Every structure is written in C-alpha cells, then in structure tokens.
C-alpha cells in the first residue's frame, strides 16, 4: 500500500546543516551584532545574524550553506589554504565563486525551490567575482569543478543521502509549491 508523505525541505536543510556541522566539528553561532553570515577560519566557526533578519528561509539556508562551503578550506577538510586571503583579490574571488556555486548546488540537491529573483542574485554575485579574475575564460570551469568537490564533500559529511532516506524513501519529481514539499511514496 502506498501513502503520500510530505518532506519539509526547509526542515531537511536545517537538519543537513546541523549534521554537517556536527560531523565537521564546526560551530554556528548566532550573533545579533553580525550583519551578514561569515566563516571565521581562525575560530573555525560561522557567525550568523538572527534568523529573522533574513528575507525568507531560502536566504537563510543558502547563506549558511555558503559559509559552510568556506569552512571546507580548513586543512582537516578539503584544505584550500589561502595565506592572506583578504588581501589576495584573485584568490578571494575564487573562494567566493566556489562557495556561491557550491551552495547553489547544495540547495538544489536538498530540493529547495529557487525563485527567479534568487537565481538572478546568484548570477549577479558569480558574475561580480568572475569579473575579478576574467583574464582566463577557463576559470569558470575550474570554479565549477571546485564547487562540485565542495558540495560533494559537504553532502557526504552532512549525510544528505541518509537524511533523505530517513525522511522516507524515494522522492517523486513533483514539487508542491504551496506547501514547499515533495510528494513521496513509501
């Protein structure tokens, strides 16, 4: 007998982030003085403003995932070592490209609906950083490869597949935009 079950993808995203942080031994700290999320490599933590300061759940999840992507630069994770990252514009631009593209991959893999306005924001952000290093058109392929490596690492460390299975078997391709859930078959 089949019965329909709905997965709340926002809940799934939060559980995935929690599991990644736990397994990566990474802290997320809500800081009311913080204006935007930031990964602090020295402390190996992500600082985020109050969740209510984000426009919507997608903004919150994608911003936190963006910072989780930066956390993979740590030596005990993927080890992208950037001495003086903030003063090396090209390396900084690469890191931002990696994180923005990888966080978009992660949101898609989780199943979070991305509205056109958000896609436009991602596109503008990627284009801004791409312009910083556009001397070589091959760079975008390098950024895509780096982003794929990051998203795969985070998915494994955050046990995304296991969370999807825990949330109940196979996902149908039909997404209910009103409830922000997938229809499932158990």
Question: Residues of each region from the PLM?
Answer:
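Active-site scaffold of zinc-dependent metalloenzymes
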Residues: 1-59, 63, 71-78
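Generic hydrophobic secondary-structure packing signal
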Residues: 9, 95-99, 139, 143
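Glycine- and acidic
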Residues: 49-52, 81-88, 129-133
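Post-HEXXH active-site segment of zinc metalloproteases
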Residues: 58, 72-97, 116-126
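Long amphipathic alpha-helical segments
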Residues: 60-76, 100-118
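Long, well-structured alpha-helical subdomains associated
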Residues: 91, 104-176
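Non-Sec secretion/translocation targeting segments of pathogen effectors
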Residues: 179-186
């Amino acid at each position: 007998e089949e019965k329909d079950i709905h997965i709340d993808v926002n809940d799934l995203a939060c559980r995935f982030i929690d599991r990644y942080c736990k397994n990566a031994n990474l802290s997320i700290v809500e800081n009311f003085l913080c204006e935007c999320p930031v990964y602090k490599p020295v402390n190996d933590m992500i600082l985020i403003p109050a969740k209510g300061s984000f426009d919507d759940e997608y903004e919150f999840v994608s911003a936190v995932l963006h910072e989780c992507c930066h956390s993979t630069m740590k030596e005990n994770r993927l080890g992208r070592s950037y001495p003086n990252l903030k003063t090396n514009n090209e390396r900084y631009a690469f890191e931002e490209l990696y994180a923005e593209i990888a966080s978009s991959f992660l949101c898609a893999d989780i199943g979070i609906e991305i509205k056109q306005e958000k896609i436009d924001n991602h596109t503008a952000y990627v284009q801004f950083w791409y312009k910083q290093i556009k001397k070589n058109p091959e760079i975008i392929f390098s950024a895509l490869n780096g982003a794929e490596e990051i998203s795969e690492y985070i998915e494994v460390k955050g046990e995304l597949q296991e969370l999807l299975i825990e949330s109940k078997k196979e996902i149908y391709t039909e997404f209910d935009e009103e409830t922000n859930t997938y229809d499932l078959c158990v």
